[in-house]
A protein has these predicted regions:
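Amphipathic alpha-helical coiled-coil/heptad-repeat segments
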Residues: 1-40, 158-204
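A short, aromatic/hydrophobic, helix- or strand-capping loop or linear motif
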Residues: 56-59, 140-142, 185-189
Length: 204
């Protein structure tokens, strides 16, 4: 039946996404554990800061994307970053989650911005994003009630940087896998929507 066929496709698609996510995770971990290059502190290659927070009541129907503790949380009439940025959640249960923002976005104070715009000759932004995505931030998360990351220990994180050319090559490979994951997630969503539609038709 069509329903059975969709179930099979959903299962196959889910397995494929799982394998790709496992692959990118393994490759990112290799960047942190095995990479050879110059060892630098994060504050030597980036400006690290918490931007101004806006309240949820200020969010709008349309406008520029707003990034908070859980990635995109809504839209706002203005932006506080013209270029795309790496940001790390620094408050709450998702503390240590790494996001890569779209250009012209508003980043709130619930995230710490790792701004490498003044170091683009030494740092490939996408490489650093993948590198930090594999980093275990538990060692610098503080606070018993609400977990948080403060700036000082973050500034002292040791990062291994190969040549800019090598960074760009590795980032390109990881970006290709990331793009495949996103495409396959969209396909999975379509299959799931088709299944829901089919189930609704059966019970009308």
């Amino acid at each position: 039946s069509l329903l059975h066929l969709l179930d099979e496709r959903i299962a196959t698609q889910s397995k494929l996404i799982e394998e790709l996510e496992s692959l990118i995770k393994g490759l990112r971990v290799r960047l942190v554990q095995i990479e050879k290059g110059n060892i630098v502190h994060l504050n030597e290659i980036a400006s690290i800061y918490q931007p101004q927070t806006i309240s949820s009541t200020e969010l709008t129907e349309d406008g520029f994307l707003v990034y908070g503790a859980n990635g995109i949380i809504g839209k706002y009439k203005d932006y506080n970053h013209k270029t795309e940025q790496i940001c790390i959640t620094c408050r709450g249960n998702t503390c240590g989650m790494v996001n890569y923002t779209k250009p012209m976005s508003w980043i709130t104070g619930n995230a710490m911005v790792i701004n490498t715009d003044e170091h683009l000759n030494d740092v490939c932004k996408r490489y650093l994003f993948h590198y930090l995505s594999a980093y275990n931030f538990n060692c610098i998360i503080s606070g018993s009630g609400q977990p948080q990351i403060v700036r000082t220990p973050l500034e002292k994180l040791e990062i291994t940087l190969p040549s800019i050319l090598e960074q760009e090559q590795k980032a390109m490979i990881l970006d290709m896998i990331q793009a495949k994951i996103e495409i396959n997630n969209r396909v999975l969503s379509l299959y799931q929507e088709q299944k829901q539609y089919l189930l609704r038709q059966m019970f009308i």
